């Protein structure tokens, strides 16, 4: 470590020390002494699993010294917060009056009212529509059959005459129409 002290004094940063100047770096023919004083080499860290990206390159495993110098280069303070798209921000907004959660009708309206001009290009529009559809249809908790039922009911309400639509809305919503 004596060889690195002038470099540390000149640069003020251990990150500027070349790796070959660090203790234990480079090729040495003598094994390092562990804390007990024997001349046996220290136990190496466990080998990475073959499926990991570092499996073929054992040198890619950071040493504690390299990790410490990398930590000194990290910026101090909070990381910049990215602005979430409007649809995601609205979905995370506080619940409405009386602590009610946003229902499927709210998410359906957001999906149906989305316009291409709200997005920055076709890929972003696709991504936002996909997210809005997931919030509305909830494929994580609903079956395909339930999702189809929701879509058919919505389309039926859209094509029914006004009088029939008013009667349909007053009826029970748990009655299935497709089977």
UniProtKB/Swiss-Prot annotation:
Alphabetical list of SMART domains matching this protein: SCAN (SM00431)
Region: Disordered, residue numbers: 1-104
Keyword Nucleotide-binding applies: no
Claim: Glycoprotein is one of the keywords in the record: no
Gene3D superfamilies: DNA breaking-rejoining enzymes
Keyword terms of this UniProt record: Nucleus
Secretion signal span: none
Alphabetical list of InterPro entries matching this protein: SCAN-C2H2_zinc_finger, SCAN_dom, SCAN_sf
Domain SCAN box: 108-166
Compartments (UniProt record): Nucleus
GO biological process: positive regulation of DNA-templated transcription
Compositionally biased spans, kind Low complexity: 52-80
Source superkingdom: Eukaryota
Pfam families referenced in this protein's UniProt entry, alphabetically: SCAN
GO cellular component: a single term: nucleus
PANTHER family: PROTEIN ZBED8-RELATED, SCAN DOMAIN-CONTAINING 1
Binding partners and assembly: Interacts with ZNF202.
Known function: May regulate transcriptional activity.
Protein name: SCAN domain-containing protein 1
Organism: Homo sapiens (Human)
Gene: SCAND1
């Amino acid at each position: 470590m004596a060889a690195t002290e002038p470099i540390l004094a000149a640069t003020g940063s251990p990150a500027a020390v070349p790796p070959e100047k660090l203790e234990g770096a480079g090729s040495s023919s003598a094994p390092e002494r562990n804390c007990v004083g024997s001349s046996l080499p220290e136990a190496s860290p466990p080998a990475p699993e073959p499926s990991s990206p570092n499996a073929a390159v054992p040198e890619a495993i950071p040493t504690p010294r390299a990790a410490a110098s990398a930590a000194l280069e990290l910026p101090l303070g909070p990381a910049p917060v990215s602005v979430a798209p409007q649809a995601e921000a609205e979905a995370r907004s506080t619940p409405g009056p009386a602590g009610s959660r946003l229902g499927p009708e709210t998410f359906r309206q957001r999906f149906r009212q989305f316009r291409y001009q709200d997005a920055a290009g076709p890929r972003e529009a696709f991504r936002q529509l996909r997210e809005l559809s997931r919030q509305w249809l909830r494929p994580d908790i609903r079956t395909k059959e339930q999702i189809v039922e929701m879509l058919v009911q919505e389309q039926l309400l859209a094509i029914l005459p006004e009088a029939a639509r008013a009667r349909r809305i007053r009826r029970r919503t748990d009655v299935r129409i497709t089977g």
